[in-house]
Regions:
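Conserved functional hotspots at enzyme active or ligand-binding sites that engage polyanionic ligands
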Residues: 1-122
């Protein structure tokens, strides 16, 4: 893991993640994802090649469910409007992170937190 990767491991960062191999309907391939784990856990993961919790992102925005969040390109740094899929929430090894892709605003992060609560019935 590079020093650059350690800097990227912040809650709200949009990073590019290599999700393969996957099973069934899991989000696959190299795609953006939002880091949602807390920064203390993220720092520990960076030191020990541990895991961070992410929400995968897709550019398929035809439907946005209550457990998903529309991510406008202008507000995130992504190349096109996308959506975060809280139903695909998962822990990934920091070794799967390929680089930076953008950031969520605090307002979008609040929406994503709510989408996670809806999905997990918290």
């Amino acid at each position: 893991m590079s020093d650059t990767t350690a800097v990227l491991l912040r809650r709200g960062a949009v990073v590019t993640v290599s999700f393969d191999p996957v099973t069934g309907s899991e989000a696959a391939k190299v795609r953006p994802a939002v880091i949602v784990s807390n920064n203390t856990a993220n720092a520990a993961a960076a030191r020990s090649c541990g895991v961070v919790t992410v929400v995968p992102v897709t550019s398929n925005t035809a439907r946005v469910h209550p457990f998903q969040v529309l991510l406008p390109a202008k507000a995130t740094g992504l190349p096109r409007d996308s959506k975060a899929q809280a139903e695909q929430l998962r822990a990934v090894s920091v070794s799967r992170i390929r680089g930076a892709a953008g950031w969520l605003t605090s307002e979008l992060m609040d929406e994503l937190d709510e989408a996670i609560r809806v999905h997990l019935a918290l």
